Amino acid sequence: MPAQAFYEMDGQRLVPSGLTRGPWDPGAQHAGPPSALIARALERCEPRDGMEIGRITIEILRPVPLAPLKLRAEVVRPGRSVELLEASLSGPDGVLMRARAWRVASSAAGPPPERPAAGPADGAERPFFPTGQEIGYHTAMEYRFMRGAFLEPGPATVWMRMRVALVEGEDPTPLQRVMVAADSGNGVSAALDWRTHLFINTDLSVHLLRVPETEWVCLEAETLLGSNGLADTALWDERGRIGRAAQTLLVRPRA
């Protein structure tokens, strides 16, 4: 039976399915699902009513293998209205990702959100990169492009939705849905041809105005190139703007 989730629990470990596989290496995960696991650990770390994650920054220390994972999270700076949290994701050979997050007191003081110009029903499916992999992250997600495509270098606007659960038997939270999708900013807006160049992110920083209220998350992404690379992504749900994501990119020709 095909996997119905990115991960399943095995005691204190999370075991990845083939749906976590990324486009760069068949033995490594796309960073979206493990980023969402970190969000899950942060959400479960001493949660408090009236507080929301306002920012998560994840450092990707090395590729995440398709192997059992463990997570740790703690509050390192407690506070009445602002808290700093840290989390780590580890595999058989040590720590793979480290993260810091600000949890802040929520407020309804802002104006009504600006609505996106068009929703996922107006988008189109586009072919994924020719990885040769029949199963992976790309088959676990739905894509509806409003602008651009995987194989068309340049800015892109795409709606994304999870086809499967993050963890078997659990409904994904709004924050987890954002993190699964946000790591795709560099992929959907590639400035160079995937067949000739690598553009791998070393981090992911997500700033949130609010968590999404719909299953679909929209990435309005652009990749900028200098001596390094930067993927800059505006994040939306079907009600309006929810935040922004940024990724530092390692850019180089394929060997």
Name these PLM-found stretches.
Residues M1-A255:
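Terminal targeting signals and extreme-terminal segments of soluble enzymes
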